[in-house]
Amino acid sequence: MELNNADMEHTGEGYMYSTREKQGYGWSHPKRPQEMSENSELGLYYSWAYASAGISYAMKTGDDTYIKQSGMTEGDQKLFKSIALLEETREGKYWEESGNFIYRLGSDHPEKKGEEYSWPYRLQMFHGDFYVRNGEVHEIPENTDGWGKIVYSDGTLKARYLDGAWQMEGFFEGIATNTVGNPFDK
């Protein structure tokens, strides 16, 4: 089962895909679904979908606003900021052709132990055929040392419902911390 952020409402006027010459723009940003505040599997699902959409949006724009609003733990937010080139992306100095993160759920339902839920996933990171850094175009190989056009990573999302919201961690399990958005020209 794919975690489908397409089920969510997005706002924005439409967009232009990134090219080798120009960074994409006009990306629609996720709109927070009401179901996120529910203490239910559906609430957890929509919270995860919102965070997933926020990750892809940040990879394209450098804006991590929706990640901050998503219920992702501070630890996972810090990890993401350390491995993604958000500032360079915001300044138009770095972009990838794609920059999409898609989570595929390992089961139809999360496992619950006490107050903690766990949900296995397979993450597909779509980087595309190229990235641009400081005006220089770099072709992305199929897969080299854990980085390439499409990269897969398995992990388990862990979540608790606290104070009327989902707190989630484990978004980037299994990702080499020096590879996401930080390719070969370090």
Q: What are the functions of these language-model segments?
A:
Residues M1-E9, E111-K186:
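Exposed beta-sheet edge and beta->alpha loop/turn motif
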Residues F101-K112:
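Short amphipathic beta-strand and strand-loop transition segments with alternating hydrophobic
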Residues G12, Y17-E97:
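Core segments of small alpha/beta cavity-forming domains
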Residues R20, R32, R90, R104, ...:
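Arginine residue identity/basic-tract feature
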Residues W95-G99, K149-Y152:
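Short coil-to-beta-strand transition motifs
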Residues S56, I102-Y103, G174:
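Amphipathic alpha-helical interaction segments
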